[in-house]
């Protein structure tokens, strides 16, 4: 659940089923009411399996209680969704769920990058020596953010070495760019000097998220856990139509 969201305030958790709303079961009849986003009373259930006397397993959703969910409202879903240090088998594992490569909102262009730096500073202070990077829901974003993330993950002796090549078309060779592991980007963050990173993926993992995986691979052990990623090894740039208010994300270069 997004921190501070109506769903979090209502106590909803992963695995909960919404069985009833305002006394009615969830059917086509209440669909319009569901979409209105007003305050509603919810009956919550969980799925349980029961083994019968004959050994047959049956399952179903059983109610566990009711809760009131406040009305929907605008909410900033920050890229650093969750981070923590997990003690495991004598080691300290850093876990980061990073959902978008975005530096910050328009009101503070580095706010989200500073959240990322703060997380890595805490990882370093906590003595993290293993790392899990959760990119399951990350569909890409800014290359600058990827450069920052990679710089804080990579082995310390790889600083200033080549991270990625951005190659444009023959008509835009002047835009070609080489990205490095740039320690100047770290600022208030920290380099963890890791030798291995475990990356959680789904088929929604794409674009810049895949660049991080591919560009770290020559310098450290990258272990993928999950399903195959989308396979979009290119950089895109959003173009906003001035009057019709739609956005096109056009491919602008290849990333190697």
Predicted regions and their residues:
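Terminal peptide-recognition signature
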Residues: 7, 15-18, 44, 96, ...
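Flexible, solvent-exposed loop/hinge segments that line or gate ligand/substrate-binding clefts
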Residues: 221-256
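Gly/Ser/Thr-rich loop/hinge elements
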Residues: 140-198, 236-238
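C-terminal, low-ordered peptide segments at domain boundaries
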Residues: 22-128
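Conserved PDZ fold ligand-binding element
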Residues: 8-28
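Loop/turn elements at helix/coil->beta-strand transitions in domains of secreted/extracellular proteins
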Residues: 14, 91-94, 126-131, 159-163, ...
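Short acidic catalytic loops
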Residues: 15-22, 122-140, 200
